[in-house]
Design a protein with these regions (language model features):
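Anion-recognition interface
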Residues: 1-309
Length: 309
């Protein structure tokens, strides 16, 4: 909400249906936002796809591995809470998240899969338990399930780096979010902060060698592991096809502990962030600014004419 998201017009889905009907081969539709679909939306989707041979494929990682990475993504959308504050908010009442409601919509994984299984049938649902130790595992397993030749799906060769933030970098972004002027809109934040300063940091492997990773406290790992076990049990009870190790519990790989507050940021880190404005984004901003100003002026004209009448 107010962070670049928008509802798709019905015509876009009609176009998609047309493409599916005209296609003579396997079509793949993929979006991370499908995990947030509620029962009503899924029922409508099933009606629109009636007549097609639909197979649903989930990729799955244990909940404890999702905590630090999810927090970083929310930071990039303007979150103003520290990691510890955010963890306390999501675990205060699992299923509800005051500051980031989409977190549990996506990560109560047993509930997510159950909704899809109820709508499309468990026999049409598969889940791939991701194995990070095997770089090609996800691509090869997915290709096998879909029935396409191996090698078509692979890691992009020239993909831009998108590493995790260090704790100091995350602290810098948190402070920016907390002090960001309220009178500036999302477009400005996205261009200058999200796709500018912060992207400049994450697209480079350069960082202060003394900087820590974001550490997750033991209590949060334990809470997440407990909820993960519940989700795994629910997924197993659904009778869907599972590929990989759903019982993995290698949570000792997660950096744990408590980061000390950051009181100073290395000057090199600040310099890299400051030169990160994306020029392509700035070009797009011109069009947005003109559109915004046009509707602002149109609104004033309409109000003035209504007063005259």
């Amino acid at each position: 909400k107010k962070r670049g998201g928008r509802l798709m017009a019905p015509i876009e889905f009609q176009k998609l249906e047309g493409k599916l009907k005209s296609s003579k081969s396997t079509s793949i539709i993929s979006s991370e936002f499908f995990s947030e679909a509620d029962s009503t939306q899924l029922t409508n989707m099933a009606k629109r796809l009636n007549g097609f041979d639909v197979q649903i494929i989930f990729t799955w990682r244990p909940l404890p591995f999702m905590l630090a990475s999810s927090y970083q993504q929310y930071l990039k959308y303007g979150l103003k809470k520290s990691y510890s504050e955010w963890l306390e908010s999501i675990f205060a009442k699992p299923g509800e998240a005051k500051f980031t409601p989409s977190f549990w919509k996506r990560n109560l994984q047993g509930d997510v899969v159950a909704r899809w299984a109820k709508t499309f049938g468990a026999e049409n649902i598969s889940l791939i338990a991701v194995d990070e130790s095997k770089p090609t595992y996800l691509y090869e397993t997915f290709a096998n399930l879909v029935g396409i030749p191996k090698g078509i799906l692979k890691e992009p060769v020239h993909m831009e780096m998108n590493r995790s933030l260090t704790f100091s970098e995350a602290s810098l972004l948190l402070e920016i979010n907390r002090t960001y002027p309220k009178d500036l809109d999302w477009d400005s934040y996205e261009i200058f902060i999200r796709k500018g300063n912060i992207k400049a940091l994450t697209r480079s492997d350069k960082h202060d060698s003394n900087d820590e990773k974001i550490l997750t406290p033991d209590w949060a790992i334990e809470k997440a592991a407990e909820l993960n076990s519940q989700s795994v049990a629910k997924i197993k009870s659904l009778g869907i096809k599972v590929v990989g190790d759903l019982d993995r519990s290698d949570f000792s790989r997660i950096p744990t502990g408590l980061n000390l507050p950051v009181t100073a940021i290395p000057i090199e880190t600040v310099a890299r962030a400051m030169i990160g404005v994306n020029m392509d984004s700035i070009k797009r901003m011109h069009g947005r600014a003109i559109t915004k100003e046009f509707f602002h002026r149109l609104k004033k004209i309409i109000k003035a004419r209504l007063r005259l009448n």
